[in-house]
Amino acid sequence: MEFQHELIIPNEGLPFKVFLFEGGNGNYVREKHWHTSIEIFAVMEGHLEFFMNKEEYPLKAGEQLIINSNEIHSIHAAERNKTVVLQIPLKQFENYFTAQRFIRFRSQDAEADGKLASLIKKLYKVYTARDTGYEFGTMSLFYEIMYMLVKNYRLTEAHEK
């Protein structure tokens, strides 16, 4: 079975893409697909169902999910929701790749996940408000998110064995 490759194009002038996903008017389905970017969904309102590696991951407000590069996944939104999506091209992490030239992340404890979700929501708000100096605020939050991902979420080769 062939799955669709989704090409991720960063927001203009930024090394990532951030946007609000609302699941249409409900009954939204995104069929199985993959991309080379890291993708994080932070649910603000409502709920979503993700399917990844034959596992179901239901998410509700306040929860998040990290989708690694090349992971085949699909999404079902039975109702409208508000979810901030952050897509980070893999090349942003190249200084932290494993010996196999790859990087993977895994969710942590609820406290760390809550902080990461909060940073992603704040990043979206600063970016969309576009107040004076928003570019600095946006990049500052992005680097804080990157730092958290690499420091607390990255799987090393020792973790994977």
Language-model-detected regions and their locations in the chain:
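Conserved metal-binding segment of the jelly-roll/cupin
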Residues: 59-72
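Conserved segment of winged-helix/HTH DNA-binding domains
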Residues: 88-103
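Ligand-binding loop in jelly-roll beta-barrel domains
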Residues: 69-92
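Short, conserved acidic/polar surface loops in the N-terminal third of protein domains
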Residues: 8, 18, 78, 95-99
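Amphipathic alpha-helical segments enriched in hydrophobic/aromatic residues interleaved with Lys/Arg
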Residues: 100-160
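Generic protein-terminus/edge-of-domain signal
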Residues: 1-60, 104
